[in-house]
Amino acid sequence: MKLLSKLILTLALATYASASESFRYINWDNPPHDVTFYEGDVLQFTTNEGRNSTITLISDTENGDKSFDGVLNEDQRSFVQKALPPGRYTFKDLNSGSKSIIRVKESKELAKEVRPIDRLKDNADAANTENAQKSPNTQSTQKGSPKSDAKEASPKTDAKEASPKSDAKEASPKTDTKQGSSPKTDTKSSTQKPSSSSDSSKAKAEANTAANNEEAEHVEKGASNTLKASLSIISAACVLSLGYLL
């Protein structure tokens, strides 16, 4: 029995050692160059969320079809697209047997980098063509602009040649005012009008002050009358109280 148990233990250790030797761990955060995959290789990488993940290689065929253990999630799919060398990769679940095939090509990543640059170049070329089309229109407008024609025959020079100011100077109405009645008397009469208005305002102010004084006198008289009445009532009450006591 002891011999059988020892044999079983040795066989188990041998199988475990052989199995452990068949699994080779490859860190794909810093992937090696020109790597060849073998059966049992385990690819280790860090996901976008910072978790550690692994993909196990099941078989490596001659035509480049590489089969891995497990169904791919989004992180593993992006990992395969970026990290693995070009080839056709088959990922299958050992329990369910479902498969997912991914083909990795170098041109796919290059196209993503080239397309935005090409779009920017196309936009720049389109903008240059638009500017080139607009530029001859502006030159034509500058060559035959109506402003230059207006300057050549402007109505301002005609107005200066025959300005009405010189005619007004020749026959100015000032000499007529000197010969006739002077306008100074009119200005005096015009200045007398505001003085009359000021007199009326003064009269109104005096009337208001007089009315206010009369109201104040009435108030003072009313107050004195109330005081007198209250004093007479108090004196009468005192007399009555004294008479009652006596």
Swiss-Prot record:
Taxonomy, superkingdom: Eukaryota
Residue ranges, compositional bias (Polar residues): 126-145
Biased composition (Basic and acidic residues): 113-124, 146-177
Region (Disordered): 113-223
Glycosylation sites: N52
Chain segments carrying region 3.5 X 9 AA tandem repeats of S-P-K-[ST]-D-A-K-E-A: 145-176
Biased composition (Low complexity): 181-213
Keywords for this protein: Glycoprotein, Repeat, Signal
Positions of Sequence repeats: 145-153, 154-162, 163-171, 172-176
N-terminal signal peptide: 1-19
Name recorded for this polypeptide: Protein 3F
Gene name tied to this protein: pspG
